[in-house]
UniProtKB/Swiss-Prot annotation:
UniProt binding sites for L-glutamine: Y54, G353, F381, G382, M383, Q384, E404, R470
Keywords: ATP-binding, Glutamine amidotransferase, Ligase, Magnesium, Metal-binding, Nucleotide-binding, Pyrimidine biosynthesis
Residues covered by the Glutamine amidotransferase type-1 domain: 291-542
The protein, known as: CTP synthase
Biological role: Catalyzes the ATP-dependent amination of UTP to CTP with either L-glutamine or ammonia as the source of nitrogen. Regulates intracellular CTP levels through interactions with the four ribonucleotide triphosphates.
GO biological-process terms attached to the record: 'de novo' CTP biosynthetic process; pyrimidine nucleobase biosynthetic process
Residues reported to bind ATP: S14, L15, G16, K17, G18, L19, D71, R238, D239, A240
Gene name per UniProt: pyrG
Positions of the UniProt region annotated as Amidoligase domain: 1-265
Length: 543
């Protein structure tokens, strides 16, 4: 039977509960345990799919097509276990399910209340389908005291009494601020946070204390005394230069040992952290550097590109180099020459996005990369803009554009239900590749034998990658574009959907309709990112 670890946060938001959960999951996994990580989000949205990147950051897409919180990306990257739609739930989803049942009459006329109906639904989600795991780590979004989080805290309070004694522990992540004028760390915010937690019936077993310096013994003693935890359960979570240093740092601080002790489990030797040691050695001692320009629409909110940043880092780890990122707002290139911004970079990456804003700037970035032989990686929207650039400037299709931006005579890119066959509007069925207006989750792609991308993947002819897009490149223009060197080297197995394009004769120019960053791991870098950074190294004359 699975044991449950609930991770809560206090004092301030953005302390890194997701990272702490992922690092602890990696430590338990390194000890031979099977772990599952889940996230409870208290917001009323059904999922983050329609939320602004500036509000929420990245939408992480799972193999089964769920649009989830970016913390699930941390879970996957640290444990290697693919997340599913069953690993993330929101208040909105809980209420939708309850109200659907109420309309059907499932509650037999009962008055629907937060307790017990909402809390029971949360508990059912938490304990569902966990028999195959030794530990289930459950992160509660937000901080203690947030009004929208109260049903979740009540549910995890109840669940300790529902399950056998000793099967549940609580870890509280908190902040120990340093006050320079006083010359000391302050424990009072943590004491008040724990007091708030205890007022709703939850006594933390372990305090995970974010700090920028070592915690003195006297402060540890004070936290243990006033927060009612053992002094050994006050764990120091020092700021780290790299997130991939966190598992080893938490182990050195004794977190995994303390978790096992809280469950009454005897520790059997040291966890196998060799792969983390290798990763951190490469991060700390790179053999060179490359600079990659990310030409995007949401560069003011770096979390909107969280998986992308990490995947570039993984490419650097694979090639033993440090990857520096130049953030460039794509709208800049609509009024200015891109050369001063891009001449010094070793690679250009144009990521996904929605809407017309900044699109022409991304097209200019693709043109610069093509003309100057700079490695170019276009992802989703970035591939579409590269195709439009080729159509306009190589194939002579001056009006080439995307129907996402309005009506156009030359729809190089269109909504996946808009394609014309002859003069007739073609409607796709839900059973086909183009069901609905959003293509979500893992789909296969057939690679052209002998293509660069096939070689990058290890000479395979079929791959599976995750998608999140409404618009697609129009295959009606395929032959005209290929005549000018833009090769369609990957298609859906039925040949309907373009998945990958590449230029023949260019050092490295690849566009993909999918999101490879979602499947990259520090210990298993995605081959496209490893190859892209390798090409950037060649461009910088490092190799």
């Amino acid at each position: 039977m699975a044991r449950y670890i609930f991770i809560t946060g206090g004092v301030v938001s953005s302390l890194g509960k997701g990272l702490a959960s992922a690092a602890l999951g990696a430590l338990l996994q390194a000890r031979g345990y099977k772990v599952r990580l889940r996230k409870l989000d208290p917001y009323l949205n059904l999922d983050p799919g329609t939320m602004s990147p500036y509000q929420h950051g990245e939408v992480f897409v799972t193999d089964d097509g769920a649009e989830t919180d970016l913390d699930l990306g941390h879970y996957e990257r640290f444990t290697g276990r693919p997340a599913t739609r069953a690993d993330n739930i929101t208040t909105g989803r809980i209420y939708q399910d309850i109200l659907t049942k109420e309309r059907r009459g499932d509650y037999l006329g009962a008055t629907i209340q937060v307790v017990p109906h909402v809390t029971n639904a949360i508990k059912e989600f938490i304990v569902d389908s966990n028999d195959a795991y030794d530990f289930v780590l459950v992160e509660i979004g937000g901080t203690v005291g947030d009004i929208e989080g109260l049903p979740f805290f009540e549910a995890i309070r109840q669940i300790k009494n529902d399950l056998p004694r000793g099967d549940v522990i609580y870890i509280h992540l908190t902040l120990l601020p340093y006050i320079p004028s006083a010359g000391e760390l302050k424990t009072k915010p943590t004491q008040h946070s724990v007091k708030e937690l205890r007022s709703i019936g939850i006594q933390p077993d372990i305090l995970l204390c974010r700090t920028d310096r070592s915690i003195p013994k006297e402060e540890r003693r004070k936290l243990g005394l006033f927060c009612n935890v053992r002094e050994s359960a006050v764990i120091e979570a020092r700021d780290a230069d790299s997130i991939y240093a966190v598992p080893e740092a938490y182990h050195a601080a004794g977190l995994d040992e303390e978790v096992l002790a809280a469950f009454g489990i005897a520790s059997k030797g040291e966890p196998g952290l060799d792969r983390w040691t290798v990763i951190n050695e490469r991060i700390r001692n790179p053999e060179g550097e490359v600079t990659i320009a990310i030409v995007g629409k949401y560069t003011g909110m770096k979390d909107a590109y969280k998986s992308l940043i990490e995947a570039l880092s993984h490419g650097g780890i694979a090639n033993k180099v440090k990857v520096n990122i130049d953030w460039i707002e794509s709208e800049v290139f609509e009024n200015e020459d891109p050369a001063p911004f891009l001449e010094h970079v070793n690679g250009i990456l144009v990521p996904g996005g929605f809407g017309q804003r900044g699109a022409e700037g991304k097209i200019e970035a693709a043109r610069f990369a093509r003309e100057r032989n700079v490695p170019y990686f276009g992802i989703c929207f970035g591939m579409q803009m590269a195709v439009i650039e080729a159509a306009r400037n190589l194939a002579g299709i001056a009006d080439a554009n995307s129907t996402e931006f309005g009506p156009t005579k030359e729809p190089l890119v269109g909504l996946m239900t808009e394609w014309l066959r002859g003069n007739q509007l073609e409607k796709r069925s839900n059973a086909g590749d183009l069901g609905g207006t959003m293509r979500l989750g893992a789909y296969p792609a057939a690679l052209k034998r002998g293509s660069r991308v096939s070689q990058i993947y290890g000479d395979v002819l079929e791959i599976s990658e995750r998608h999140r897009h409404r618009y697609e490149v129009n295959t009606a223009y395929k032959d005209r574009l290929e005549q000018h060197g833009l090769r369609f080297s990957g298609l859906s197995p039925d040949g309907v959907l373009p998945e990958i394009v590449e230029y023949e004769g260019h050092p490295w120019f690849i566009g993909v309709q999918f999101h490879p960053e979602l499947k990259s791991r520090p210990f298993e870098p995605h081959p496209l990112f490893a190859s892209f950074i390798e090409a950037a190294m060649a461009q910088s004359r490092l190799v």
